[in-house]
Amino acid sequence: MPEPLTLRMVLIVIVGVFLASFVDGIAGGGGIISVPTYFLAGLPAHLALGTNKLSSCIGTAVSAGRFVKNGYVDWKLGIPSILLALLGSHWGTLLQLSLDEKVLKWLLLIVLPIVAVVVLRQRQLPEQRREMDERRRAAVVWLASFVVGGYDGFYGPGTGTFLLLIFCTLAGLDLRTASGNVKLVNLASNLGSVFTSLMNGKVFLLLGLIGAAASVAGHYIGSGLAIKDGSRIVRPVVLLVLALLAVKVVPELFV
């Protein structure tokens, strides 16, 4: 059982989750802030991850809704992506519940340099959709939705960033459509993970709902900036998120 809810826990979660969701609403990757927030609030590892998914799920729904409203979603790619992300996330969460946390940190250490190379080699995230075989585009998007959805259930930080990079650079989607589809996939993977965590008693419901209120505000403001300003805002935030990911994970592996 979690500790009784305290004012300190509430304040830490409100501030940390708002900042995380603001970043996530622009470019994804807010989990690198929100997951440590729940640790700082005093929750053990699996409970922190499950509670984070609850607040992220509600906030991401608001962000996704703004992209849908503005027409920045490719539904032919999006509907299968949602189903695959749900499935991948469920399996990823089951695996996460069975493993030691340090395994997850080593995974990030392996993935991070690969992502950094992709970002730094790309001069800017494309504003225009690239011509390519539509079957290949769909295969890339659907495979990424399943695999990264599994990673999101397994641990999570960086999920939105990884998806955005793949959808833009490998699947050739324009930045805004990629961002809209990323939000749908991220919402689906959050739903799959939070359901699995709830079934295993790994969600602090009250604290997660408090975090959800902060998440809604952060996602709404952040996604509005992404829609208005495109890659001028998203690219620097992607690079910042990757830097934060490295600063957090690498030292913890050697403690």
Predicted regions and their residues:
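Selected transmembrane alpha-helices and immediately adjacent juxtamembrane segments
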Residues: 1-44, 129-179
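Residues within membrane-spanning alpha-helices of integral membrane proteins
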Residues: 10, 53, 108-112, 116, ...
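Transmembrane helix-loop junction
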Residues: 40, 47, 93, 97, ...
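Membrane-interface alpha-helices at helix entry/exit sites of multi-pass transporters
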Residues: 43-52, 76-80, 172-183
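Selective hydrophobic functional segments
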Residues: 50-103, 110, 190-240
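Transmembrane helix exit motif
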Residues: 61-72, 107-133, 224, 244-255
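Hydrophobic alpha-helical transmembrane segments in multi-pass integral membrane proteins
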Residues: 147-157, 193-201, 208, 245-255
